[in-house]
């Protein structure tokens, strides 16, 4: 359910684009992200830092798209977010010696120490490639194709990556002793 909730602004953007075009869809995405964070804040007392970052990026790039009537800005938004994720994953290890993937997953999965580093790099690489791929689709195809890719292509590639990662991890997961 959380996965669908996280996709709420993207799904509304997609529907609004199909019905009204890129500029109204961008306004809908900004509004949906604000509503999403307000709801999370209301339900849980605070929103996650990445939700705030996502709001800031959609507000800046979406706002520029609407104000300047130039769809290029909204097309850059996923790339900026993907690259920010990649830099954050690598930067947290280099700057603070903290593996964020491990911090998020270690309660669910027990892995040998070197595997956490590889997993972190794999996710950073995935996000870096997704940023490049988004720009490729944005500049080489129509806006309609880009919007379809933004929802279905990105989600499909993420699913393939997660399945491949799960298969790869299954060979390295360590059993935890039962009490």
Curated annotation (Swiss-Prot):
Superkingdom in the source lineage: Bacteria
Record keywords, A-Z: Cell inner membrane, Cell membrane, Membrane, Transmembrane, Transmembrane helix
Topological category with respect to the lipid bilayer: Multi-pass membrane protein
One of the record's GO cellular component terms: plasma membrane
InterPro entries in the record: YciB
Transmembrane segments: 3-23, 49-69, 76-96, 121-141, 149-169
Primary location class: membrane
Span of the signal peptide: none
Keyword DNA repair in annotation: no
Pfam families from the UniProt entry: IspA
Localization, UniProt: Cell inner membrane
Stated role: Plays a role in cell envelope biogenesis, maintenance of cell envelope integrity and membrane homeostasis.
Protein family (similarity comment): Belongs to the YciB family.
Name of this chain's protein: Inner membrane-spanning protein YciB
Lineage: Bacteria, Pseudomonadati, Pseudomonadota, Betaproteobacteria, Burkholderiales
């Amino acid at each position: 359910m959380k996965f669908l909730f996280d996709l709420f602004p993207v799904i509304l953007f997609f529907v609004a684009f199909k019905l009204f075009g890129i500029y109204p869809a961008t306004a809908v995405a900004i509004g949906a992200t604000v509503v999403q964070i307000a709801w999370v804040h209301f339900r849980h007392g605070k929103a996650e830092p990445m939700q705030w970052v996502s709001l800031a990026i959609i507000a800046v790039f979406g706002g520029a798209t609407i104000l300047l009537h130039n769809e290029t800005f909204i097309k850059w938004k996923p790339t900026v977010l993907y690259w920010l994720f990649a830099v954050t994953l690598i930067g947290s290890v280099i700057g603070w010696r903290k593996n964020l993937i491990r911090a998020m997953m270690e309660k669910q999965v027990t892995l040998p120490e070197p595997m956490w580093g590889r997993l972190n790099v794999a996710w950073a690489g995935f996000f870096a490639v997704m940023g490049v791929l988004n720009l490729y689709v944005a500049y080489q195809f129509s806006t309609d194709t880009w919007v379809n890719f933004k929802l279905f292509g990105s989600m499909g590639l993420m699913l393939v990556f997660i399945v491949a990662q799960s298969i790869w991890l299954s060979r390295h997961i360590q059993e935890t002793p039962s009490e």
